[in-house]
């Protein structure tokens, strides 16, 4: 590399908050299935602790060697509904506790995969797991849960959508002492991906290798600084600038993934190209959009600005990396983005605009606080809307919403750390009860028939 490129990378890290957001080790638990739940849990604990024993140490060694901040070291596992489903257990909270204990033992901050895939229907394991999610999240610290309720090929399982509204509500109540923190670790998906390194939606797909390393990069501050240098230029120039910047960011992710793979003796999977914000000043996706010329995110033009950003990040990132995957786009989590928080407080950004933006961006309605008296049916209807956007547009969408008990519009919900602070946003006051009560399945769209 030329000296100026090395200096540029150092500046990106020191001044523009460029970092590797996560190194996530995906671990298959398919060989841990057992008719005896206790035996299965012992196998699960042993496998996770054995495979991930050096994950945190290797991450820290790479940080020291290259001077690249690696914010999180995490683990994803095969959806537990599949693994626990072979046991005779009638409650899976003990499986969640096993995951939690393993995560603490190896020192990772989150473990994902307390999950069920029910886009077309339930198995016994799915039913038990989904029913146990509120207690599992209330009784663990590091476990993340996700449920896939729809896909472009199968349509939307509206029975699962209805149930997830109830699950979110119950989770908020059981974790009311932490302002509904359990809901921040629960994601409802359509078109969930099998190699996502980001929490809370990560799980290790059944089509994946026994063990793999996936990397999630992040650099909103770097992209914003690059756009500052092309003020007033046409969008062609803006797109090209973002592309070139995304290339540099992703190159770093590729390097870290390869080195981690070699040091751990585990195959390198993918780099997720997502721009993931944090609550820190200078690390905001909203501020990138505003740098393109919007007075505040949420105003007219926001969706178009996000479309340009998302597409340019993918085009630049794909050139820099052998295998891309995960969610790959821009995240717009309200509580984790200083610009989003401000826009909500100023009344510039509402749920309806966020929903429009999710037709473009990486995920969906993410880290949004709504009033504590929001009904389970309203939450389910929000999930149905997001799932419909994902299913019709053949993309991943998701809902991570927090109906924090006792809160009303305008209150602030404090999570701390990377999860940030969420202003409580108003929801539509009209009822969706009869709509959600129908149940059944919304059929797959006509363009899903590809064969």
Curated annotation (Swiss-Prot):
Disulfide-bond pairs as recorded: none
Highest taxon above the source species: Bacteria
Range of residues in the leader sequence: none
SUPFAM superfamilies: PFL-like glycyl radical enzymes
Pfam families linked to this entry: DUF711 (PF05167)
Subunit-level organization: Homodimer.
PANTHER family: UPF0210 PROTEIN MJ1665 (PTHR37560:SF1), UPF0210 PROTEIN SPR0218 (PTHR37560)
Family designation: Belongs to the UPF0210 family.
Protein name: UPF0210 protein lmo0534
Protein species of origin: Listeria monocytogenes serovar 1/2a (strain ATCC BAA-679 / EGD-e)
